[in-house]
C-alpha cells in the first residue's frame, strides 16, 4: 500500500534524527546557520515575548528563539517526530533552559489557542507538510494581532546555470551524502524531492498574502537556494 506524504515524512525523520544536524551542515555547507542568524536579526525578537517554532525538529531555531526572548519570555517547539524531539530535548537540557517547552504535535492542527504568540517560525519544515496553506493558516491563527510569522525554507534558484547545478546537487549528490554519512540514501532522496517540488519565492509570498498576512517580506539567500518569508498578522484580527 502506498504511503501518504505525511506517513513517509514521519518515517524519514524518525529514521534520520540522530544524523540530522550533521547532515544539515554537510548539505548546506553550514550556510543554514548564517541564514537563520540573518533571519533572526530581521525578526528583531523582543525580550519577554512568546514564540512558537513549528516543525522544530532538533530544536536549533527553538533554542535561538529562547536566547532571544530571554528567561522572562516563553518558547514552544512543536514537531511530529518523537525521535527528533528527543535530540532537541537533550540540547535544551544542556543549556538549562526553563522557559522552553517541546511539544509532540501536528503542524496541520496546532494545539494552541488563537492569538497566542508574538512570533511563529517554521524552518525547513513547510515543504514537508501535506498542505502548505493549511499550515500557514494555522500559524496565522495562533499568532497575536501584530505578530510576525516567518518561514525559512529551501527555494528555487533563478540564476541561469546555477539553477541547473543546484538541481543536480540535490538530485544526485545529496542522497549520496546521505548514504555515506547517515546510511540513509532513500530518506535523503525524499528531501531532494520535497525541495524540488516546493514553491518558488514569489509563489510562496502570494500564499502568505492569501493566508491573511500583510507587509510580506522576502529575502533570498545564496542565489535563491533558500529564502526567508516574513509576514505580519494585521492588528485587530
Curated annotation (Swiss-Prot):
PROSITE patterns: SAM_MT_UBIE (PS51608), UBIE_1 (PS01183). Keywords: Menaquinone biosynthesis, Methyltransferase, S-adenosyl-L-methionine, Transferase. InterPro entries: MenG_heptapren, SAM-dependent_MTases_sf, UbiE/COQ5_MeTrFase, UbiE/COQ5_MeTrFase_CS. Its EC number is 2.1.1.163. It catalyses: a 2-demethylmenaquinol + S-adenosyl-L-methionine = a menaquinol + S-adenosyl-L-homocysteine + H(+). CDD domains: AdoMet_MTases (cd02440). Pathway: Quinol/quinone metabolism; menaquinone biosynthesis; menaquinol from 1,4-dihydroxy-2-naphthoate: step 2/2. GO terms for biological process: menaquinone biosynthetic process; methylation. It is an enzyme of class 2 (transferase). S-adenosyl-L-methionine binds at residues 58, 79, 106-107. GO terms for molecular function: demethylmenaquinone methyltransferase activity. Belongs to the class I-like SAM-binding methyltransferase superfamily. MenG/UbiE family. Methyltransferase required for the conversion of demethylmenaquinol (DMKH2) to menaquinol (MKH2). This is Demethylmenaquinone methyltransferase.
Amino acid at each position: 500500500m502506498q504511503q501518504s506524504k505525511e506517513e513517509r515524512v514521519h518515517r524519514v525523520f524518525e529514521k534520520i534524527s540522530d544524523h540530522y544536524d550533521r547532515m544539515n551542515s554537510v548539505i548546506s555547507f553550514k550556510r543554514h546557520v548564517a541564514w537563520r542568524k540573518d533571519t533572526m536579526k530581521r525578526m528583531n525578537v523582543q525580550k519577554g515575548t512568546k514564540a512558537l517554532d513549528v516543525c522544530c525538529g532538533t530544536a536549533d531555531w527553538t533554542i535561538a528563539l529562547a536566547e532571544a526572548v530571554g528567561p522572562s519570555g516563553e518558547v514552544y517547539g512543536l514537531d511530529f517526530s518523537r525521535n527528533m524531539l528527543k535530540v532537541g530535548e537533550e540540547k535544551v537540557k544542556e543549556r538549562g533552559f526553563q522557559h522552553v517547552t517541546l511539544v509532540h504535535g501536528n503542524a496541520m492542527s496546532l494545539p494552541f489557542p488563537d492569538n497566542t504568540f508574538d512570533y511563529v517560525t517554521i524552518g525547513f519544515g513547510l515543504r514537508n507538510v501535506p498542505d502548505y496553506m493549511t499550515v500557514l493558516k494555522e500559524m496565522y491563527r495562533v499568532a497575536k494581532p501584530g505578530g510576525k510569522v516567518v518561514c525559512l525554507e529551501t527555494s528555487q534558484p533563478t540564476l541561469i546555470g546555477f539553477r541547473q547545478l543546484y538541481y543536480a546537487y540535490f538530485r544526485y549528490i545529496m542522497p549520496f551524502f546521505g548514504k555515506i554519512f547517515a546510511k540513509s540514501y532513500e530518506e535523503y532522496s525524499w528531501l531532494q524531492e520535497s525541495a524540488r517540488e516546493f514553491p518558488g519565492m514569489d509563489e510562496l509570498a502570494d500564499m502568505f498574502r492569501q493566508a491573511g498576512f500583510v507587509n510580506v517580506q522576502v529575502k533570498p539567500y545564496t542565489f535563491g537556494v533558500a529564502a526567508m518569508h516574513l509576514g505580519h498578522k494585521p492588528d485587530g484580527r
